[in-house]
From Swiss-Prot:
There is a cross-link at T52-C60, T61-C66 (Beta-methyllanthionine (Thr-Cys)). Kills a number of Gram-positive bacteria. Acts at the level of cell wall biosynthesis by interfering with bacterial peptidoglycan biosynthesis. Specifically inhibits the conversion of the lipid II intermediate into polymeric nascent glycan strands by transglycosylation. May interact with the peptidoglycan precursor rather than with the enzyme. Residues 1-48 form a propeptide. The modification 2,3-didehydroalanine (Ser) is found at S64. It comes from Bacillus sp. (strain HIL-Y85/54728). There is a cross-link at C49-T50 (Beta-methyllanthionine (Cys-Thr)). This is Lantibiotic mersacidin. Keywords: Antibiotic, Antimicrobial, Bacteriocin, D-amino acid, Lantibiotic, Thioether bond.
Length: 68
């Protein structure tokens, strides 16, 4: 696929429908919907670090002010 065709498929949804499919195939055809429902929310999120301010709020910034 040429660069122009790739860019056209990004911008134009009709062109995207007519372009070649994903080389890996359709990932949703391998799993049944019931199997995918079991995957959603399958794990608990556990924070590695919890930082709270004296007022009860938590703040972390890009400058690493809340290093654990």
């Amino acid at each position: 696929m040429s660069q122009e065709a790739i860019i056209r498929s990004w911008k134009d949804p009709f062109s995207r429908e007519n372009s070649t499919q994903n080389p890996a195939g359709n990932p949703f055809s391998e799993l049944k919907e019931a199997q995918m429902d079991k995957l959603v929310g399958a794990g608990d999120m556990e924070a590695a670090c919890t930082f709270t301010l004296p007022g009860g709020g938590g703040v972390c910034t890009l400058t690493s002010e809340c290093i654990c």
